[in-house]
Amino acid sequence: MITAMGNSGICPGDVMGLTNGLASPPGKKPLFSFGIISDVQYADIPDGHSFHGVPRYYRHSIHVLQRAIQEWNSHQDLNFVINFGDIKVNYEFQKSNRPVYHLIGNHCLYNLPRDKLLPLLKIPGINGLAYYEFSPSPEYRIVVLDGYDISAIGWPQGHPKTLKALEFLEKKNPNSDKNSPEGLQGLDRRFVMFNGAVGREQLEWLDGTLQDATKLKQKVIVCCHLPFDDVASDQEALLWNYDEVMNIIHQYNCVKACLSGHDHRGGYSIDSHGVHHRSFEAALECPPDTDAYGHIDVYDDRLLLFGADRMQNTEMYFNS
């Protein structure tokens, strides 16, 4: 049975989308499996609301993470965990008995500068940048992008990347509050301060990494806090230069899925080149006694996302 997620950015025509009764293929073991969670944003403050009036459960989100860690620790075949960004505390992740790979989000950068954040999260970045890659099996490569490479947050005042981002926002967003998309139309709504861009050096690295994966006949999963597709995400959550990133990705056949956080509602799409896009439902927006986390089983021909509660199951078959 195929289901669509109402207002969650899922395109009902995407027949390779979501199922309620998701099951592993009979007789096949995954090549590897990994846990996923995004946008925990725990804080010891009263519940609040987003810019759009969506409830946020700041104190409860830590319980979502605790239940996720407990579930992952008991999963015999889980290989690692990916946190898709926006955490304010790290100690719960330290209870994981599997390796945890972190992506940085805007709320991470609001709380700590990069020079403190990256060592704390054990991100193997260079020159303060948080992009890297690893290969959990010979058949696959995971590529992690730093969506706040060019950003008005996280870098020191006066840093060239900060100045470049502020200059860019001044041209693109006429509002005095650069976090507001008011008056911006369509895809231009992404030009807000809580988003960012992938810089030139990182784009060249991505291109080289995908070239190498192609030579090795590896499939690639690209991960970034910020989404790259406006069907799988609200327009105002998109990476500023998502089009440049996707232009590189679409030059190769190796990238099978782009996974992200930031959007909070969650969403799914398949683009015109057959690349799957999945933005994950936020732990922050789980009312008490509900959850949003999951794990992904990776096969040679598909990804199967098994979600807890508000995290929707997703079946992602590859075209080739």
Task: Annotate the PLM regions.
Residues 3-26, 51-55, 89-216, 241-254, ...:
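Extended active-site neighborhood of metal-dependent phosphoesterases/phosphodiesterases
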Residues 2-88:
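N-terminal active-site segment of His-dependent metallophosphoesterases
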Residues 31, 78, 97, 217-219, ...:
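A general structural motif
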Residues 211-231:
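Short acidic, glycine-rich surface-loop motifs adjacent to enzyme active sites
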Residues 222-228, 256-266:
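Histidine-centered catalytic micro-motifs
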Residues 39, 85-86, 105-106, 225, ...:
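Active-site glycine-centered loops adjacent to acidic/histidine catalytic or metal-binding residues
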Residues 44, 229-232, 238, 267:
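Short, solvent-exposed loop/turn segments at secondary-structure junctions
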